Amino acid sequence: MARLPRWEPEDPKFWKETGSAIAWRTCGITTFSLIFSFATWFVMSAIVVRLPAIGFKFTTMELFWLAAIPGFASGTLRLIHSYFIPVLGTRPVISIATIIKLIPMVWLGYAVQDLNTGFWTFMVIGFLSGMGGGDFSSYMPSTSIFFPKRLQGLSMGIQAGFGNFGVSVVQFVTPWIIGFAVFGAAVGGPQIFTKADAIKGAITVTKDNGVVKDVVINKPELASAITVVKDGNVVKDVVFQETDTIKGIKVDVKKDAAGKIVEVVPTKGIKVDVTRKPTGEITDVTVKNVIKKPMWVQNAAFWYVPFLILAFILCAVFLRSVTVKARGFKGQFEILSTRNRALTHSWNCTITYITTFGSFSGYAAAFPMMIKTIYGGFDGAPDPLAYAYLGPLIGGLIRVITGPLWDKWGGSVGMLYPILGMIGACLALIFGGYLTPTGLEKFPGFVYIMLFMFLMTGTANAATFRQYPIVFAYSPAKGAQMLGWTGAWAAYGPFIFTSLIGMAITKTGSAIPFFAGAAIFYAYANFLNWWYYTRKGSERFDFGNSGGTWWDKLSDGEKEKMKHIDLHQ
């Protein structure tokens, strides 16, 4: 039976005899599917940092746009998904949402193998990848409907927490899985990956008004391989020539009959980069150690295919749908009505969810590119993907841990203090000089502060899963809608955060303007949370199962009145 005829999770007898097993089975299967939804959503953010190294000529801002566009798609799609579950049910929505993500993954896998693939093609693929984030607004409402209020913080914390591990999965697995031919030649050959690091102290460059006047070779072993050509007091050229001990960089590539690369032999050597003005004057000279090796970037997309197929089968076979009172798609917009002050609380919840999950997803998408652009220009620059997975991992894990705590102590309390921590992290980044470093000595501190930011966003986000159904306690359907609605707007986080950080860096040279604005926004959100939900006597307070909620304090008559108002009665 695809649709369950009866579902009363608040009935203790029904929950014990029937509901609990079905609800936890549903949570387990949908969480497995959600992991790979998040992974496919963020796969572009992991791939973009590798595109320049395999030959794609995109600007820094274009790379930020590629990392951002899945977030734009996910936010837009969540606005649609937020109304699906009450109307269509869990089984068809989650099943279709799972299998359709094969389209962008397969397309992306082939696109990265062709250096002629244009920026706008990648933008379309990135937009489609956003389907993996869009369906989150179907997962959360589904889970909220299946569980009683006392377990909603726990169940949704588990689902969102483990589901968010998908972000860590993509950023952790990608560097490893693109390093070998996991699928053989079945899905294509390798690309040529180039890594070039400046040799510290190899040369001393003297400039006058931005033009190189002299180049002194400091390392004796390089003196016989590098020739500085001068005309008077101006350097005209710097020429590199191999010696018996100093080798240039050569690439040994084997191709098939169609001209496609089938093998790349790893090589390393020395390269001299000479930067010139359009008029020919030399503006910079660097000597680099260059490594070229094979890389199978397509694996970063293709390896999700079997897992998506497995998740689809599990969803189609084992999931069930619950009948929820809904008044069609038009009725779903009643969370924006003035009845029972729904509009006010919809606005408040949207702001706080953007603050929590919007920040988590936004920083998760932007973190690799932040590392690359802020610290990637220094000698021995860190690999962004070696650190990027840590933030989402911490943020996802803390959701699972703190979900039960906010059931006990209250969602509004669980949001108040972590948001203060987020404000502190913004100020530390700004005033600690971590956004305008002069060397790598600031990098460890930058990483620690960003990981603290992820910890705080995850903690606060876990509290929302408890709080929002309590705010709309008079209508389980509206509580489910609110989780979908707020999730839709917060899913724009990767788009907004990544694009604004990229713009700030491009236009001002640092991300300081972004984090200053973020701190102000967080302060506003925390004020709303305190005024309406946390302070003594607030309108819809939530002090957890131990301290009670606004709904618990109402009389039966007051509760029935709110329900009648909600239903136009």
Regions found by a protein language model. Name each.
Residues 1-39:
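Cytosolic juxtamembrane N-terminal segment immediately preceding the first transmembrane helix
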Residues 1-7, 186-196, 275, 280, ...:
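Flexible cytoplasmic inter-helical loops of multi-pass small-molecule transporters
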Residues 41-49, 171, 342-396, 461, ...:
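Extracytoplasmic gate region of multi-pass secondary transporters
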Residues 65-83, 389-402:
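Central cavity-lining transmembrane alpha-helices of secondary-active solute carriers
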Residues 99-115, 420-440:
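C-terminal ends and interior cores of transmembrane alpha-helices
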Residues 133, 153-179, 484-497:
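Glycine-rich segments within core transmembrane alpha-helices of 12-TM secondary carriers
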Residues 303-328, 525-533:
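C-terminal membrane-cytosol helix-exit motif in multi-pass small-molecule transporters
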